[in-house]
Amino acid sequence: MTSRPLAISAGDPAGVGAEIIAKAWRALRQDGPTFVVIGDAQLLASAGGGVKVRAVTRPQEAAQVFPDALPVLDIPVLSPVVYGRPSPSHAPQIIRWIETGVGLALSGAVSGLVTAPIAKAPLYEAGFQFPGHTEFLAELTAAASMVGARGPVMMLAAGDLRATLVTIHTALAKAPSALTTEAIINSGLVTAQALRKDFGIAEPRLAVAALNPHAGEGGALGREEIDIIAPAVEALRALGVQASGPAPADTLFHPEARARYDGVLCMYHDQALIPVKMLDFWGGVNITLGLPIVRTSPDHGTGFDIAGRGIARPDSLIAAIQLAAKIAARRGV
């Protein structure tokens, strides 16, 4: 396992981020992985139910601090925080926490970045221009050199299911027109590359989901399978990827089907998210593939409805931390 800590950006201060980070530290403080939080130290202490917090100035200090206190690179929120009430006034700090984490990961000071949940609406009100975390991280890392196909490609992992998305934060009504053969090929290449490099699968098998019911019924229910998806599958095969499909999505996620592939390429957001959350609602992990840094996050949102009540579960964040550490170790960072 890498000796460098992970970084965790604290997410929206009005949500459950600080609470689940404190709970994750309690669960991992003795056996790791070690991490340093980028956020508001005072908020983390209060949200964590009295958890001991220690401000650090460098990530390298985290290893010594971690068994006894939660190490924090303290960047305070500059406006009042009310749990459950997100505010555009928090946007500068939220963005700075993410930017700081990316900078530390790119410099090698940390082994990877785990991001606590953010809410898009208050960020948009403050002028944020990206559909979500994934696209913002791609922009922040765009100048970094990287070998092979690059992302961002969103993967959701739960148990033995690893599902990647061709269209990410796209309205369902717009997803069909957003599909292109080139996008499917790139997502497939990035996924196959990640399965080899990050998950240790020497010869990954990739299933490709159809868009339409019954894979389009030979064009009767839509031509996307014929005109867009099938050509992408053929191109992936020609490029050396063990790809199969397009297959009807309702046949791809039962246990026997999952045994026949190592990753599944989904055409739109909920085609991947629904089976992942059905399989493991509490423990799913979001991984951004195709970046020059390791990035994971919990597979849930900000939890404004339960923020400040002390009942948020840290399972998904813990899984995200553990998976980020495993990927970093495989990459040797």
From Swiss-Prot:
One of the protein's GO biological processes: pyridoxine biosynthetic process
- Keyword Magnesium applies: yes
Localization in the cell? Cytoplasm
* Keyword check for Lyase: no
Residues that coordinate or bind a divalent metal cation: 169, 214, 269
Q: Its Gene Ontology molecular function terms?
A: 4-hydroxythreonine-4-phosphate dehydrogenase activity; cobalt ion binding; magnesium ion binding; NAD binding; zinc ion binding
Q: Name one GO cellular component term.
A: cytoplasm
Reaction catalysed by this enzyme: 4-(phosphooxy)-L-threonine + NAD(+) = 3-amino-2-oxopropyl phosphate + CO2 + NADH
- Quote the record's cofactor note: Binds 1 divalent metal cation per subunit. Can use ions such as Zn(2+), Mg(2+) or Co(2+).
- Name the InterPro entries on file: PdxA (IPR037510), PdxA_fam (IPR005255)
Pfam families with a match to the protein in the record: PdxA
**Enzyme Commission number:** 1.1.1.262
User: Which key words tag this protein in UniProt?
Assistant: Cobalt, Cytoplasm, Magnesium, Metal-binding, NAD, NADP, Oxidoreductase, Pyridoxine biosynthesis, Zinc
The UniProt record gives the binding positions of substrate as: 133-134, 277, 286, 295
**Cofactor(s) annotated in UniProt:** Zn(2+); Mg(2+); Co(2+)
State the superkingdom: Bacteria
The EC class name is oxidoreductase
Q: Spell out the family assignment given in the record's similarity comment.
A: Belongs to the PdxA family.
The free-text function statement in the UniProt record for this protein reads: Catalyzes the NAD(P)-dependent oxidation of 4-(phosphooxy)-L-threonine (HTP) into 2-amino-3-oxo-4-(phosphooxy)butyric acid which spontaneously decarboxylates to form 3-amino-2-oxopropyl phosphate (AHAP).
Q: Which HAMAP family match?
A: PdxA
Q: List the protein's name.
A: 4-hydroxythreonine-4-phosphate dehydrogenase
- Which organism is this protein's natural source? Caulobacter vibrioides (strain ATCC 19089 / CIP 103742 / CB 15) (Caulobacter crescentus)
What is the phylogenetic placement of the source species in the record? Bacteria, Pseudomonadati, Pseudomonadota, Alphaproteobacteria, Caulobacterales
Q: Name the gene.
A: pdxA
